[in-house]
């Protein structure tokens, strides 16, 4: 009967371990969510446990040092972003979970940056906003748009969460718009507002499909073409004018040309053989401001291809060279002794190097003797 005792001990130990595991991992009530400011100090109580209760603290499953405790409370100094996490307090002997805190470290919001722009005039405009610095915790924004005393609907952008769209109800209105935005989070609140006239926020998107090409046989010309921005809804009724800038890559200074109409321009003063960068901006003909610059186009003016001599072109020169090589040099004359009045019979010609003037005089004398 002595043998079953060890087995009984093992069973008791296993049951005890199961109880401890169940106590540490059994479902508990949702942790308390707490927000604290970056750089501050915080004291986390262990639920309803007495101050002198023997407890152990863990964060995200890792034990914390005992020197961080003040009794049963956990004290954290100079909070950093890395302090965010799930803090749990256990009874030191039984490992019974006493309390949980989900700590978020962040900042209150600063005054938001708000701007409005009409790139689809005269259909409407949009407003967008952002915080100048991150808060590291969730923020809630609320936007209000007034046209005079009338509240306008601001439809949320389907893709950009910090943007909404407003449709113009009355074109060419002299009544100002006022857009207000407030932002809040668990640590604070802030707000701002802007007021503007309809025409002051008109700003088209940049021109599209900017292309630059060399002009054949013109080493100083580049032909530039572009398209009106596709977001501009009615270019016939609300025409755009354009501003073109260009420069060779070797220089930093831009040259500018303002164009009242059309979507093409020929640059006539380009440096031959130098690569150029070209950009175009757009603006409503009467109101608003210039768009941002378009995507840059690059091009190099036409250059003449170097001419390479062909075999056919070289042939006449070879013939001429061969013929001239057979001619006597200026100071050399091929003479026949018979021509010099030697009286002998025909013989092979031989070379006599004499000055040209002497050779001509000798030839003249020979001719006179033959006439006599």
UniProtKB/Swiss-Prot annotation:
It is found in: Cell membrane. GO terms for molecular function: interleukin-11 binding; interleukin-11 receptor activity. Residues 1-22 form the signal peptide. InterPro entries: FN3_dom (IPR003961), FN3_sf (IPR036116), Hematopoietin_rcpt_L_F3_CS (IPR003530), Ig-like_dom (IPR007110), Ig-like_dom_sf (IPR036179), Ig-like_fold (IPR013783), Ig_sub (IPR003599), Ig_sub2 (IPR003598). Residues 27-104 form the Ig-like C2-type domain. GO terms for cellular component: ciliary neurotrophic factor receptor complex; CNTFR-CLCF1 complex; external side of plasma membrane. The keyword Oxidoreductase does not apply. Keywords: Cell membrane, Disulfide bond, Glycoprotein, GPI-anchor, Immunoglobulin domain, Lipoprotein, Membrane, Receptor, Repeat, Signal. Belongs to the type I cytokine receptor family. Type 3 subfamily. The WSXWS motif appears to be necessary for proper protein folding and thereby efficient intracellular transport and cell-surface receptor binding. This is Ciliary neurotrophic factor receptor subunit alpha. The gene is CNTFR.
């Amino acid at each position: 009967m002595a043998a079953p005792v060890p087995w009984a001990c093992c069973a008791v130990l296993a049951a005890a371990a199961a109880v401890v595991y169940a106590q540490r991992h059994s479902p508990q009530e949702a942790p308390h969510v707490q927000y604290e400011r970056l750089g501050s100090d915080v004291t986390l109580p262990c639920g309803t446990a007495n101050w002198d209760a023997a407890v152990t603290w863990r964060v995200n499953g890792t034990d914390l040092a005992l020197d961080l405790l003040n009794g049963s409370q956990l004290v954290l100094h100079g909070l950093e972003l890395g302090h965010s996490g799930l803090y749990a307090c256990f009874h030191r002997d039984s490992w019974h979970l006493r309390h949980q805190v989900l700590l978020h470290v962040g900042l209150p919001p600063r005054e938001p940056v708000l701007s409005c722009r009409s790139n689809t005039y005269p259909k409407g405009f949009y407003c967008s906003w952002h915080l100048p610095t991150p808060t590291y915790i969730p923020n809630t924004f609320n936007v209000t748009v007034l046209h005079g005393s009338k509240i306008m609907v601001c439809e949320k952008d389907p893709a950009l969460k910090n943007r909404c769209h407003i449709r113009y109800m009355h074109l060419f209105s002299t009544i100002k718009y006022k857009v207000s935005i407030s932002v809040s989070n668990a640590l604070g609140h802030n707000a701002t507002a802007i007021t503007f006239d309809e025409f002051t926020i008109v700003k088209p998107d940049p021109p599209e499909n900017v292309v630059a090409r060399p002009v054949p046989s013109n080493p100083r010309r580049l032909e530039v073409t572009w398209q009106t921005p596709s977001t501009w809804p009615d270019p016939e009724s609300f025409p755009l004018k354009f501003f073109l800038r260009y420069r060779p890559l070797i220089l930093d200074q831009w040259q500018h040309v303002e164009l009242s109409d059309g979507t093409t321009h020929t640059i006539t003063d380009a440096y031959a053989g130098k690569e150029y960068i070209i950009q175009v901006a757009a603006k409503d003909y009467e109101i608003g401001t210039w768009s941002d610059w378009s995507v840059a186009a690059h091009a190099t003016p036409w250059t003449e291809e170097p001419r390479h001599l062909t075999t056919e072109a070289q042939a006449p020169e070879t013939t001429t060279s061969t013929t001239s090589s057979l001619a006597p040099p200026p100071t050399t004359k091929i003479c026949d002794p018979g021509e010099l009045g030697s009286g002998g019979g025909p013989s092979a010609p031989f070379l006599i190097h004499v000055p040209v003037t002497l050779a001509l005089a000798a030839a003249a004398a020979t001719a006179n003797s033959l006439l006599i």
